[in-house]
């Protein structure tokens, strides 16, 4: 592979790969930090990240502002999205909370700082992914066996009123995490397990998720046995692919069973989904890989992979590297950002593929979490291209589970 790095080389190249020290120009340009926060772990932090100079970290809302579950129970603030269109676009931050039962969706007024729960149900389990649609609704879903995807009807004129919602089983009963909705109404989702597939829902009518067809991705040229998840051969799942239509009667019961019936490609814990133009990115956590699905060319590329175009982590040796990619975000200049499900949890920024090999030209370390028990989740660029929102989930520091933002000065 053209950008292959050995672990030994990674010890030298912890900041960035194949590029200058400063990560691009634009509204969120930065100088990569020296490495993961291995020696800076603290449960009494004032700021949650080791971050580059020139950036300001500010609390948006934690459990001192809104404590949904009380006592020692973490709110498990997970994913974030703005009300991206309509009246007061960008004023409100809508968040999921990934608790095992009685899950919740909360809203923060970014002007006043007020935060309230707008949707909660005893049957909500592990609410995770969230996405604003171009038709003005909010999608959120459960990351659990039998998980459902819901469509919520958020009213920015009455933002703290109980939000009406409806289940959309036609998009698939799955272990949902990432959700990506295109302007034409197409929705991309995943099944979050080793052996999970990647799915595309095409509605019969744009904006109506109650009727349509779910498809699963199938890489071309592989036998049915080779389509199965295998930790030793997952890199073979690249190249040309097709979308295979699934049995909708089975989809609304268990879309993973429907995908298995057509021998759809299986991946290692696909988690978040991010759409940038006509490319869909999926973080495959077990594979230490982010794949790029080129919708125009019908080609799947390995966009980021530990040991290829980003160093492999070796904490025992003090080597910063890429480990367990989880959530994804698109910055205002169209770059893909990645956060790890790891301790210390790191945030990485990519530079687009300009030489046509399907890989990110550079992958650079932006920040690292200092709390010894926390992971970063929910990275999200909203309407301000100089601001990145993120959550600190299940920290050691008391009442600190919640949302922050980091802004370039």
Residue map of PLM features:
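Secretory targeting and sorting signals
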Residues: 1-23
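Sequence/structural signature of beta-propeller domains
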Residues: 23-409
